Amino acid sequence: AKELAAAGGAGVITPDIIPEEADAWVSATDDALIDRVFLVAPSSPQERIEQVAQISNGFVYAASTMGVTGTRTSVSVDARALVARTREVTSQPVCVGLGVSTPEQAAEVGRYADGVIVGSAFVRLVLDAESPSQAAAGVAELAAGMAAALRTARRGGQA
């Protein structure tokens, strides 16, 4: 956590640390003033959502679906209900990720979540690029498309 803070990092999404085993991590992130973000899933019981919301700071990551990260053709309908269940127990932002890979999906999620998390779609662009400049252009284009779709969706329009 200290090294991350020294490098300019502000927070970490921790998919592989469970709250019951996070005491050392919580202490380290508190000392380093680093936000820690834990995940809730559609299968999480309400008690677990409360526990995750209490230990997270920065935001709560609502996984749109069960499983591993990666691009998908659609965002699970369970995500909206999970955001609502999480908002019942926290005032922190609730952001949705796992499977968001297109501007249309980002707009859909942006209509009910506080934030949209995109990872694999950007990684795929970088890995598939033939050069660093092509990777940068692809990432910039996707980010701009998602931002525009989110702005339109937040104003009540269609992406």
Language model region names:
Residues 5, 26-30, 83-90, 143-154:
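Surface-exposed amphipathic alpha-helices with a cationic face
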Residues 14-32, 45-51, 69-84, 103-106, ...:
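Active-site-adjacent beta->alpha loops and helix N-cap segments on the catalytic face
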Residues 44-54, 96, 100-116:
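Catalytic cores of alpha/beta
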Residues 11-21, 60-70, 99, 112-131:
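Glycine-rich phosphate-binding active-site loops on the catalytic face of alpha/beta enzymes
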Residues 1-16, 150-153:
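Active-site beta->alpha loop and helix N-cap motifs at the rims of alpha/beta catalytic domains
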Residues 29-39, 87-97:
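Short beta-strand/loop segments at the ligand-binding rim of alpha/beta enzyme cores
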